[in-house]
Design a protein with these regions (language model features):
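Metal-centered catalytic cores of metalloenzymes
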Residues: 1-65, 69-128
């Protein structure tokens, strides 16, 4: 069972307004939204955590397909296709490590990007 179905089931089985309220607090603080077809989804998909850095892909994004790296002094985005730095600041050493990591994880990044596209997203799936 996927995590979204677990959340939906837990809320459906809530026995009090307090339980429902806690569920709503979790959804609002956890970065969730609803697809047009009524399905729950996560606005941000955590790809990995590495030494305090979070690597995330957001669901409803602008072109080109990219991932975000945040943590410490780093807040930058990189192209999924070629790992070109699109915006933000990152040190030379960290950038080299992110590029190396990208070379090993590109297929997984593409898989996550493609699985998190809402139907109305201006940037569709990446064709490999």
């Amino acid at each position: 069972m996927n995590p979204y179905q677990l959340i939906a089931d837990k809320l459906s089985n809530a026995e009090s307004l307090e339980e429902l309220t806690k569920g709503l607090e979790h959804l609002l603080s956890g970065g969730y939204s609803i697809w047009e077809d009524g399905e729950l989804y996560s606005i941000r998909q955590l790809v990995a955590k590495v030494n305090g850095l979070k690597i995330e892909i957001y669901s409803n994004e602008h072109p080109p397909p990219h991932f975000h790296v945040k943590g410490g002094d780093i807040k930058a985005s990189f192209s999924i296709i070629d790992c070109e730095q699109l915006e933000g600041k990152v040190g030379r050493r960290e950038k080299a490590l992110i590029k190396w990591w990208h070379s090993k994880g590109k297929e997984k990044l593409i898989e996550i990007w493609n699985s998190t596209r809402p139907s109305d997203c201006t940037v569709g799936a990446i064709n490999t």
